[in-house]
Every structure is written in structure tokens, then in C-alpha cells.
Amino acid sequence: MASDLRRVTFNYPGSVSGPVAVIGSFNQWNPLAHPLRRIDMEWRIEVFLPPGTYPYAFLIDGQVGRDPSGHVLYGPLGGRYSVLTVAD
């Protein structure tokens, strides 16, 4: 249900030229699903997600990078991802 969704804001700081997108388990790691918009000196997007824990990363100009302000999860193949927990 839509009432079970929580608003989540993803921010990527800095003056990278872009494009920047957020990829994660909530969008099947699809780089086209959630592109961020540049607002002032950061990139930003708001999405609505159900409660849960989600590994995610940023795709910055085609390169995968983790959220510099997020918690780190180490994947089974050695990759590093950020972790988002959406509370009930």
C-alpha cells in the first residue's frame, strides 16, 4: 500500500559533472530508474520505499561508488555498498 511507503532522500555531495544515479536492491540495480538532479552543490533525489534494509550505491559518470556518509556493507564478491534502513 502507498501508506506503507516512506520518503527517502538520497544526496551525493560534490561538484562531479555527472550523470549521477542511485542503484540498489530497491530498483534491481537499474541505472536508469533513479537519476539524481543537481541542486546547488549536490545531487539529489527523493524516492518512496517500504520499510526494510537496502544495499545501494551511486553510479557517478558510469563508475560505481558508495555513499560517503553511509554505512558500508561488503558484498560476497568483495564489492562495497552502502546500506539504507527504512524504519517502520
Question: Could you describe each region identified by the protein language model?
Answer:
Residues 2-53, 61-88:
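Aromatic-rich carbohydrate-binding modules that target alpha-glucans
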